[in-house]
From Swiss-Prot:
This is AN1-type zinc finger protein 3 homolog. Residues 42-149 are annotated as: Disordered. Zn(2+) 1 binds at C18, C20, C32, C35. PROSITE patterns: ZF_A20 (PS51036), ZF_AN1 (PS51039). A zinc finger (AN1-type) spans 150-199. It comes from the Eukaryota. The lineage of its organism: Eukaryota, Metazoa, Chordata, Craniata, Vertebrata. Residues 49-59, 67-92, 105-114 have a biased composition (Polar residues). Zn(2+) 2 binds at C156, C159, C180, H183. Keywords: Metal-binding, Zinc, Zinc-finger. The keyword Zinc applies. Zn(2+) 3 binds at C173, C175, H189, C191. Pfam families: zf-A20, zf-AN1.
Amino acid sequence: MGDTGSERSNAPSLPPRCPCGFWGSSKTMNLCSKCFADFQKKQPDEDTAPSTSSSQSDLFPSETDSDNGNTSIPTPTVNPTQQLPTELNVDSPSKEDCGPCTDSAHVSLTTPSKRSCDSDSQSEDDTSPMKRPRLLDSGDRPDNSSRSKQKSRRRCFRCQIKLELVQQELGSCRCGYVFCMLHRLPEQHDCTFDHMGRGREEAIMKMVKLDRKVGRSCQRIGEGCS
């Protein structure tokens, strides 16, 4: 019985609890390992705070001393009479100098308007000659009477080269002249005949016209055959 009582008295005691709820240790101030590490991290910050304040206090006296030293430096004095002539020379322009400047400014402002009007009139004059040839081109071409008659149909009317019978037949144009193979096309000899208008008229004449019956009468299939 005595042995059992001594064993109970000598039973190991439980470790202390950390405020976070985990088991702590007497070596770590009854804190767990995590809380003890956080506690150690906070201690250097608390130690450095007073040191920084002391360093700032050490710096401020030096700044004040430097300020006092700057104020003690004598500043050179400047005579006000020396500055007055320069200010007067810069800021006091005479009216005689400004007069011609303003006049020239007015002249320069008024002259561009006149030039612009002149340029507009010149541009209209320049454009009008360009419109006249277009009106001539759109109008009718000169008649055959303005051109001289061909003396010999055996020669080209343009280059006066001698033509054979076959060339005379192939080179004859509707304008009434005979040309060689180099000048037989209308674009090459400034033909006065309206080939495009004649072609349109011929195309209209050759068009197939369909006879359409207009009315309401109906005819059955086969009535015409019977």
